[in-house]
Regions:
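Mature N-terminal segment immediately following signal peptide/propeptide cleavage
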Residues: 39-68, 83-85, 140
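Short, aromatic-rich amphipathic segments at membrane interfaces
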Residues: 772-804
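Long, well-ordered mid-to-C-terminal structural blocks that present hydrophobic/aromatic surfaces
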Residues: 515-568
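N-terminal secretory signal peptides that target proteins for export/translocation
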Residues: 1-19
């Protein structure tokens, strides 16, 4: 057993003799002071802690919280009641009276005795749950635990194995029977009830456990059903980040398990830099310091620097794959190249096993905000009920803080920008909240001032408050950011002309679009995911050097359920090995100007390649079963009677927000933005040979090989999702009913490609009028030479044309009236003459 083995190894290292213990007990305090400057050991603030047996070895360890914090006082008080003056056993268990035998002190390996990783979801009802019971209760319905959306996505890519249903999760879980068990306000609960009625396949009642991957003795089944490889792919690659495992131990991926995944700091290098001399400083996989990070009140000291909040890099430990929102937020774009070279002349060090180029950072990141400053407790911990996709579990929208040009955030109706419908939300003003939610009172409580802003779904935004007509965002890192709402900025005329036109002049933009459709400066776009799952086994494939296998992260999580492994701090040494080796490649990368489409909320959104697998599967005998195969979803799905190609273009919030929005032309004059793809590639479903050839393309040598094999069915580029007739040719999202590509009608409405021709087909001399004006402008020096001058000219032409047409329209009734008056005056004398003659 892993824990017992570690205990034996550490016992030999740390307990070579009882005399050694006496030396350690006398010298640890001075030693720790030199090893961890700035991070105070517990004994400094609680001298009585020295009486705990734990301190005989761990005297230099940092305070888990600030000594004056309510949490630290509660820990120490409870520790005294339990007979531990240092309070260690409150979270870790063990025997604080034992000072000679580590095995006894650590209480063995069973979860009922000792918790080396107190945050682990497998035992945290006994640790974190003592004070944070509601958070512990809801962790099992968190999307970070179930990963149901990710699982459904891979199943979709392998031929829509479950259709739109989010059937499977890492672990079996179901909703509470009482609707009032959902954490949040009554308004929020009612709102979520309505969403469940709209999207029952996403807001599900229960998840079944993910099916097992093929065992070594089952590989013969692949030839009959290659889709079984999907479960190997999911379990080896996709699920290593979920909440119930410590995950991959690579640079950038080091983290805790369960609550500790977020609330314990780990550096990218994974080394411990605190004051506990018993922790090996040469080994990776350790926390940076033994202190909890969380809200503004939770101060963490590392060497001589004190910070608060959860750093973005903690979140990026997991959020560096898939939509890559974590690294994108930081301004990092994945690249296949290892440049620029490191200081020693070697390659750029791998981070999350990848390499990066520096891009523009999200403006919120630039302002010092972290993920938790926008994302609420319900977003990350769960509200206790299942939501099987990101868009389902996140309750916030841009307008919640920024409002619109004509309404403050508190004047907006609930559900604005979160409609899950094709029209904007309507209704009465949402107002503000006067108090926080009950289950978040242990965090930092900010002065409500004129009220806490409400999220789109009706919960208080507990760090964002109204102050008159302004908004204050209290960041976990300690900043109080005062922001002007859009309504204020428009009133003060502080919005650029482009912004005024886009947000104030074109109503449909805010009625139908996500703010980030324009304000995302870039999006990582990895076109074509070439997945190979190689099941070659040496006994079936004599020329193979080894039998290929990998680590099953879901099985590792379930192994934690076993009594002897509930308290394990990680998965090292686990035997959860399954056959198959997964490798991934891409066709090409882009970042600029993402295409647009419709998301599940019914709004225009950026799209990026989601899961676009071209699947290659190698059987146990080393022979290919599938090569470059793209599955199709079931007939009838995604607006296709035959079944759409399952290469998905996913609606995304890129987390690359900037004040400067993308240009009008980047949408209205772009085929890519409309979903028509990137021009320039040849058909991917053709084999491409590169060798000596004749002018009519006959290959001259007899001995040649294809440079690029054909990819079956892919008769268009990876970036195309719809054709010019509005026929969708690939899937666009696979979670929600409304996600799709633009229709033909929408394409025509959006596209302004070729607008230049409207003027220039008549210029300079195609008609007498334009020829005359062009020559006058040319010889008087008025021809526009810059974009600004051109815009001014077009503006003048538009105004002149408009006034001229208005004048004509106004002149017509005036002429009619004048003509009538003239006619009446003309015929009146005739009538008068007739009357005189008759007299």
């Amino acid at each position: 057993m892993f824990t017992a083995a570690v205990s034996r190894i550490n016992a030999r290292v740390l307990f070579p003799s009882r005399g050694y213990l006496r030396v350690v007990a006398l010298s640890l305090l001075s030693l720790s002071a030199s090893m961890s400057r700035g991070a105070d050991p517990i004994i400094k603030h609680f001298p009585e802690a020295a009486n705990s047996g734990c301190m005989k070895c761990h005297a230099g360890i940092e305070l888990i919280r600030d000594p004056n914090s309510p949490m630290m006082r509660q820990i120490m008080d409870r520790g005294r009641l339990l007979g531990d003056s240092a309070g260690c056993i409150v979270c870790h268990g063990g025997d604080p009276k034992e000072t000679k035998d580590k095995t006894i002190a650590h209480g063995g390996a069973h979860a009922t005795d000792f918790y080396p990783a107190p945050g682990s979801p497998w035992i945290n009802q006994h640790t974190c749950g003592q004070c944070h019971q509601k958070h512990v209760d809801v962790q099992w319905t968190s999307l970070m635990m179930t990963e149901a959306g990710k699982i459904q996505g891979v199943c979709w890519a392998f031929g829509s194995l479950t259709g739109y249903q989010h059937r499977w999760a890492n672990y079996a879980v179901k909703n509470p029977s009482d609707p009032k068990a959902r954490l949040g306000t009554d308004i929020y609960r009612d709102y979520m009830r309505r969403l469940k009625q709209i999207e029952p396949d996403v807001f599900v009642d229960a998840h079944e456990p993910l099916p097992e991957a093929l065992r070594f003795d089952e590989l013969h089944r692949l030839k009959e059903d290659p889709t079984l490889a999907a479960f190997t792919y999911i379990r080896q690659e996709c699920q290593r980040c979920h909440h119930a495992v410590k995950g991959r131990q690579k640079r950038g991926d080091f983290r805790g398990i369960g609550c500790s995944s977020c609330h314990t700091p780990y550096s990218n290098e994974g080394f411990y830099e605190g004051g506990d001399p018993t922790i090996n400083r040469e080994a990776t996989g350790h926390m940076l310091v033994h202190t909890i990070q969380g809200t503004r009140d939770a101060k963490v000291t590392v060497h001589e620097t004190t910070y608060s909040g959860i750093p973005v890099e903690t979140c990026t430990t997991c959020h560096d794959r898939g939509k890559r929102i974590g690294v994108s937020f930081q301004g990092l774009m994945e690249t296949p190249y290892h440049s620029p070279y490191a200081a020693d002349g070697g390659p750029q060090p791998a981070l999350h096993t990848k390499h990066y180029i520096a891009m523009e950072q999200d403006i919120h990141y630039q302002k010092g905000m972290t993920c938790q400053d926008c994302h609420t407790s319900n977003d990350v911990h769960s509200d206790g009920f299942l939501a099987a996709a990101n868009l389902a579990s996140v309750q916030i929208e841009c307008a919640d803080c920024h409002g619109t040009p004509d309404r403050y955030p508190w004047e907006l109706p609930l559900g604005f920008m979160d409609e899950f419908a094709m029209k904007p939300a309507s209704g009465s003003a949402r107002g503000v909240a006067t108090r926080q939610l009950d289950h978040t009172h242990q965090g930092t409580i900010y002065d409500a001032r004129d009220g806490y802003l409400l999220t789109a779904r009706g919960n208080p935004y507990e760090n964002v408050v109204r102050d008159g007509d302004e908004v204050i965002v209290h960041t976990a890192a300690g900043k109080d950011l005062r922001i002007k709402t859009l309504k204020q900025l428009f009133a003060e005329k502080k919005v650029s002309q482009e912004g005024t036109v886009a947000m104030g002049g074109v109503a449909k933009h805010l009625d139908r679009m996500e703010c980030y459709a324009c304000h995302s400066s870039w999006t990582p776009q990895c076109y074509g995911c070439h997945v190979k799952v190689d099941f070659s086994q040496k006994h079936k494939c004599p020329e193979c050097l080894e039998s290929l296998k990998g680590f099953d992260w879901v099985a590792a999580g379930r192994k934690h359920e076993e009594k002897d492994h509930r308290a394990d701090r990680g998965e090292e040494g686990y035997d959860t090995i399954i056959p198959g080796k997964v490798t991934e490649q891409r066709s090409y990368l882009r970042w600029e100007e993402p295409m647009l489409g419709i998301n599940g909320e019914g709004r225009v959104t950026p799209l990026a390649p989601g899961c676009q697998p071209s699947v290659t599967i190698i059987g146990e005998d080393g022979e290919p079963i599938l090569v470059n195969h793209i599955y199709k979803v079931d007939p009838g799905l995604e607006r296709s009677e035959e079944g759409q190609l399952s290469i998905d273009m996913s609606p995304t919030q890129p987390h690359t927000t900037t004040k400067q929005a993308r240009s009008c032309e980047s949408c209205h004059a772009s085929k890519k933005a409309l979903g028509l793809g990137i021009d320039g590639t040849r058909p991917w479903n053709e084999e491409h040979v590169v060798d000596l050839e004749t002018a009519d393309k006959q290959i001259l040598p007899k001995q040649y090989q294809p440079q690029m094999e054909a990819i079956e069915n892919l008769d268009h580029d990876w970036s195309r999702i719809v054709d010019e007739q509005g026929n969708q040719v690939a899937t666009v999202g696979h979670h929600f009913q409304l996600s799709r590509a633009f229709t033909r009608e929408e394409q025509l409405h959006i596209s302004r490609e070729g607008t230049c021709l409207a003027c220039h087909k008549e210029l300079p001399n195609q008609s007498l009028a334009t020829s005359f004006l062009h020559h006058v402008a040319k010889y008087t020096g008025q021809l526009p030479k810059t974009n600004i001058e051109h815009d001014q000219l077009v503006h003048k032409v538009v105004l002149m044309s408009a006034w001229l047409q208005l004048g004509i329209v106004a002149l017509i009734p005036m002429l009619a009236i004048g003509g009538a008056i003239y006619h009446r005056r003309r015929i009146r004398p005739l009538f008068e003459g007739d009357r005189e003659g008759s007299t």
